[in-house]
Amino acid sequence: MLDQDLGQLGDGLLFAAVIVYALAMLGFAGEQASRKARRAVTAVRAESKVLLGAGGPPVTLPPPSPPAQTITVESPSRAGRFALALTFCGWGVHVTSLVLRGFAAHRVPWGNMYEFSSAAALVAVTFFLVLVARGKVERALGAFVMLPVVLYLGLASTVLYTAAGPLVPALNSYWIKIHVAAAITASGSFLLSGVVAVLYLLRNRYDGRLAAGQPVRFPVSLGAQLPAAPVLDRVSYSVIAFAFPVWTFAVIAGAIWAESAWGRYWGWDPKETWSFITWVLYAGYLHARATAGWKGRKAAWVAVAAAGALIIDYYVVNIFVVGLHSYA
């Protein structure tokens, strides 16, 4: 098979992976809808149970005590199992698309923004599947994870698409296997942690309105479908705690590569500046949790701000800002 054919096949498989991920997202959403329906039926039945006193007025049962802030294991639904299977299938197709892309270009498959985005999304999906397999998050959370992944890959396949080909001369170095691979791993993980931080804020807002007796409207009402707020907080923290050392290594490796390519370790190029800003925000997040006890809303907002800096670092700087990294 010709290199061009391999490249086209890899592109087609990525498109297929996006379709499978989208179907998985619908399956996860279906599982959430079925759980919501079961909870509604259970609530109606509980309210309808009345104890009749001896010759007295009806006495309603007291409301049950609130559940503990842990993940509850419910009977698996067919939609949820099917969605998880689809996610695994999409993951396999996604991996194959990247491998074929590498064979077609005769290099590592992360030499441009299109390939970087695909690889980072793959890391996010991989991390999610690992968390589900280890019981750290509920399977139904996949609806909220797959949505940004599908949008992310859709953007990469349309706006950022680049045909398979050789590296630009500036990237033709063994450091691309080290520096960029670390950046991809950290970026995909940070993408997932940012999504979970947003979901935490949604759940926290939902709990607050419910406790205050205030009306709950969309999108805050989506918080009812999410795991408990402390669970989301722990998941976001765990992912960032893993990704931050990897990002630190990526920044250091990039500085070493810069010295080899441009004769200096650091020059405050726009890419370097925003990579450092991103590093500072995530370092501040971890430091605040460890020393000041920042958890919950404060920590979540810092995580969201850091994810925003990462997006600026990757998209805005690479596309709209002229600098030494403009070729990326």
Language model regions located:
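Polytopic transmembrane helical bundles with strong interfacial aromatic enrichment
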Residues: 1-328
